[in-house]
Amino acid sequence: MPIRHCIVHLIDKKPDGSPAVLHARDSELAESAAIENMLADLNESYNAKQGKAWGLFHPESGAFPFSGWLKEYLDGGQDFTAFSRVAVEHLQKLMEESNLSVGGHVLFAHYQQGMTDYLAIALLHHSEGVAVTDQLDVTPSRHLDLGQLHLAARINISEWQNNKQSKQYISFIKGKNGKKVSEYFRDFIGCQEGVDGPGETRTLLKAFSDFVESEDLPEDSAREKTKTLVDYASSQAKLGEPMGLEELSELIDEDRPKAFYDHIRNKDYGLSPEIPADKRTLNQFRRFTGRAEGLSISFEAHLLGSKIEYDEEAGTLIIKGLPTQLTDQLKRRN
């Protein structure tokens, strides 16, 4: 993962309405194994984060100037340090307007992954821990807590520059229940949601369920194809990449690589050729689970409609082919 440019600034602010104080670095960070490891860990944590949203820049304006500064940097009008400085000053201003915001170290990293250029921006915080010294003493130790990543965004620069129709070249952590505490960070990037990740994923899963039903597949085959879909989607989510419908179709049925793709197009589900994978929605698709008053039920989603029938009006489940272990226990009860 070649790192083109990387810099860190510090905004010191407490969530009490006090002014935000900027401590800006005046030069880029030199290449090092530590920087590479930090960015690799950041990407891993970011990709694993649930609740991300995908979108595109608002038209450049006084309210949303970030995309203009980024374009100026990419066009050679200013260097990376100057770009990050004007951007972090804008973030500082928005922080002061948001009483709930807290400061932290602001990372800007322009890097390449494969043939694609990305810009990652993250607000990082420290955690207090302990370490053992060479003299075997235990001493306090501070470290960047990349596992607790709450404000971060990643811009696919290549997609932004080369695909003017794209509405998903920016991803950002949306926050639980769309918390307003993170809105200032989204406004800092100047991002508007262009793709409903959970909604698109739900539509894809609905299309897949319809496909399996229309093909009248045996249970083993349905289970195998379900696993293929979920594994592929989870893998793409881990990489931070969207799911390609044509690629997915080829994986689902190698003998008929276009079958699922043609099903999606013919039924007009309205899906884009590439969609972001929402991990929370995928996890719900794997299994249905529920627990109440001493009763716990969990079953694989593909069993619904075959071994398990749901009567919505009566609020009942009918289970066919009970596990032998369960029937033995029930028999022993008598």
From Swiss-Prot:
Query: Looking at the keywords, is Cytoplasm present?
Result: yes
The name of this protein is Nucleoid-associated protein PFL_1060
The answer on whether this UniProt entry bears the keyword Cytoplasm reads: yes
Q: Which species does this protein come from?
A: Pseudomonas fluorescens (strain ATCC BAA-477 / NRRL B-23932 / Pf-5)
Ordered alphabetically, the record's keywords are: Cytoplasm
The superkingdom listed in its UniProt entry is Bacteria
- InterPro entries in alphabetical order: Nucleoid_associated_NdpA
Q: What is its main location?
A: cytoplasm
